[in-house]
Regions:
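Long, positively charged amphipathic alpha-helical accessory segments at protein N-termini or as interdomain linkers
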Residues: 1-34, 58-64, 68-82, 101-234
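Active-site-flanking structural segment that lines cofactor/substrate pockets
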Residues: 31-41, 49
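Short glycine/proline-enriched loop/turn "hinge" motifs that connect secondary-structure elements
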Residues: 38-44, 115-117
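Short, exposed beta-strand/loop patches in secreted or surface proteins that constitute
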Residues: 39-40, 87-88, 205-207
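Short, compositionally biased low-complexity segments
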Residues: 41-46, 134-137
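DPxDG-like acidic metal-binding loop motif
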Residues: 43-55, 65-70
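Hydrophobic residues embedded in beta-strands of well-ordered beta-sheets
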Residues: 47, 95, 213-215
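Catalytic palm active-site di-aspartate
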Residues: 87-99
Length: 234
């Protein structure tokens, strides 16, 4: 069986069955594994993977890894898939392919204190490859990668490409800050200008602040939902 090949400083850990790569990555990170661990499960119908990071900035700034990994996914699929396939990113981590929901990104960290430097952070990817039913049109708002003209995209190559393009994004973020990431993410963002409810706040999704917090204009004022709201398990 072939195994994925990753850039230097990244290492792979394959799991299968009932083991969730995201949970496994969090457990390994809590035990002190090196940053760059890629836990993955290349299932027949579902691609699941998780990256372990060791941020050296405050959590509120490190949360940029979530949109950064989203941009990395778009770049990865853009390099391997047909040019007409469109990828968009939801603020909360959801992925959209050709307008329909297709997988998600997740995030966890060792701490939920926005001003603390976390010991570790994990970003997880879940991507359906094939529809769950034989009649995918029954749920038009949901899709799968291979139902959107990407049947020639190899899941392992997509995983490798995601890690590679995410690394490029990390290097740019480290050298230049969030300016380029903001530009790239906004060009791929889904839902700006639309009505939304997040953290029990309803209003118009105006965009994001410097640290990718969601700005929602309600009747009374503009509310900010920090990206740390999306942290799991804290």
């Amino acid at each position: 069986m072939n195994t994925p090949s990753f850039p230097p400083l990244f290492s792979g850990l394959a799991v299968e069955g009932q083991v969730d790569p995201f949970d496994k990555a969090c457990a390994e990170a809590a035990r002190g594994c090196d940053a760059g661990l890629v836990v993955h499960d290349l299932g027949a119908n579902l691609l699941r993977a998780a990256l372990v990071f060791a941020p050296d900035v405050e959590l509120v700034d490190a949360m940029a890894m979530l949109p950064l990994c989203g941009v990395g996914f778009q770049n990865a699929l853009g390099a391997l898939g047909p040019p007409e396939v469109a990828v968009h990113l939801e603020w909360a981590g959801g992925l959209r392919i050709n307008g329909a929901s297709c997988g998600t990104l997740r995030v966890a960290a060792s701490s939920s204190n926005p001003k603390a430097e976390p010991d570790w952070m994990v970003i997880g990817l879940e991507l359906p490859l094939w529809p769950e039913t034989d009649t995918p049109g029954d749920i038009p708002e949901q899709t799968a990668l291979y139902a959107e003209g990407c049947a020639d995209v190899n899941a392992m190559e997509l995983l490798e490409s995601w890690v590679k393009h995410t690394l490029v994004g990390i290097n740019t973020w480290t050298e230049d800050g969030v300016k380029t990431l903001h530009k790239d993410w906004r060009g791929l963002s889904h839902g700006i200008g639309e009505n939304i409810t997040m953290n029990e706040i309803s209003g118009t999704f105006l965009g994001v602040d410097e640290q990718f917090g969601m700005l929602i204009r309600a009747a009374d004022t503009t509310h900010l939902v920090p990206l740390t709201y999306l942290l799991e398990g804290t």
